[in-house]
From Swiss-Prot:
InterPro entries, per the entry: Dimethylallyltransferase, IPT, P-loop_NTPase
Site feature (Interaction with substrate tRNA) residues: 101, 123
Quaternary structure (record): Monomer.
A GO BP annotation: tRNA modification
Residues the entry annotates as binding substrate: 12-17
Function: Catalyzes the transfer of a dimethylallyl group onto the adenine at position 37 in tRNAs that read codons beginning with uridine, leading to the formation of N6-(dimethylallyl)adenosine (i(6)A).
Name of the coding gene: miaA
Superkingdom per UniProt: Bacteria
Keywords (A to Z) from UniProt: ATP-binding, Magnesium, Nucleotide-binding, Transferase, tRNA processing
EC numbers: 2.5.1.75
UniProt-annotated binding residues for ATP: 10-17
A Pfam family of this chain: IPPT
Annotated protein name in UniProt: tRNA dimethylallyltransferase
The protein's required cofactors: Mg(2+)
């Protein structure tokens, strides 16, 4: 009989952490984090990383596994999941994937494009061009070479602009076409995925604001100050571009006021939640949607997982 893998997705501040731990207890599971920010050590408050007390007796994976200066790709995530699932099953446990990084879920569901690896020389060339002419110029160049990719990539998204241009320069082909035609990896097993969705978006927005202010009370700015002591980290580092951290960095640089920092941090988190919900809505035919406000949501999820 083919093994099943269970999943719980949802936007930030939707209550995934406490719900997932309760569910993991019920189905005898270990949790694999599906969150691109939780992999980093020393980034605890701003990522709402579950504490050891919150984790309780449930073993969690892919939390605190790399330094903020290191990178962790979708391919790295898939490789880790495929290794961890076997270890978890060998212990007689179920696998429960929990998080809000939808690109990770997408990689598991659809597989990953087998595109060429990054080349340092090309990256350095692109970085020199960015410094000389600006990121908007590079986005315009991408638009000339691959309009479809340029339309999908935000003009301020340096990481994705660089990657698209890099692949075009290496292969001589359009990035958008290669992404569609070269898929590898993904899960062999069936993924039974539930996603939390708010019936009332204003409640989620209020929760986001409340949690952001709680993070400040818990010492979020002290956490960022500690990260700033590492000379290898800047506000352009992938880890520091996580929601909240970049805005805190700008405030501590003196670029914005404290009030602007708080406002921008909350707005950025709400925008993240909106993007997460867009992913979920696009997948609603393949996953089970569960309203955040539903008082019986845990039971609904357990029934979908065939645990009564």
């Amino acid at each position: 009989m083919n093994k099943l893998i269970y999943g719980l997705a949802g936007p930030t501040a939707s209550g995934k952490t406490s719900l997932s731990i309760s569910i993991a207890n019920k189905i005898n599971a270990e949790i694999i984090s599906v969150d691109s920010s939780l992999v980093y050590k020393g980034m605890n408050i701003g990522t709402a990383k579950p504490t050891l007390d919150e984790q309780g007796d449930i073993k969690h994976h892919l939390i605190d596994i790399i330094e903020p200066t290191e990178s962790f790709s979708v391919a790295d995530f898939i490789t880790n999941v495929n290794k961890l699932k076997k270890e978890i099953w060998s212990r007689g446990k179920e696998v429960l994937l929990v998080g809000g990084t939808m690109l990770y879920f997408k990689g598991l569901i659809e597989g990953l494009s087998s595109l060429p690896e990054s080349q340092l020389e090309i990256r350095q060339t692109l970085e020199l061009e960015r410094k000389a002419k600006g990121l908007q110029y590079l986005h315009q160049q991408l638009n000339k070479m691959d309009q479809e990719s340029a339309q999908k990539i935000n003009p301020n998204d340096q990481q994705r602009i660089f990657r698209a241009l890099e692949v075009i320069m290496i292969t001589g082909k359009k990035y958008s076409e290669l992404v569609k035609t070269s898929k590898v990896g993904g899960l062999e097993e069936q993924l039974k995925l539930c996603a939390l969705v708010p019936n009332d978006r204003s409640i989620l927005h209020n929760n986001i604001e409340l949690r952001f202010k709680q993070m400040l009370d818990q010492g979020f700015l002290d956490e960022v100050q500690s990260l700033r002591k590492n000379p290898k980290l800047t506000k352009e580092t992938t880890a520091i571009r996580s929601v909240g951290y970049r805005q805190a960095w700008e405030y501590l640089d003196g670029d914005i006021s404290y009030e602007e920092f708080v406002k921008k941090g909350i707005v950025a988190t709400r925008q993240l939640a909106k993007r997460q919900l867009t992913w979920i809505r696009n997948w609603q035919d393949e996953i089970n949607l569960v309203e955040v406000e539903n008082q019986n949501k845990e039971q609904q999820i357990l029934e979908y997982f065939d645990y009564k």
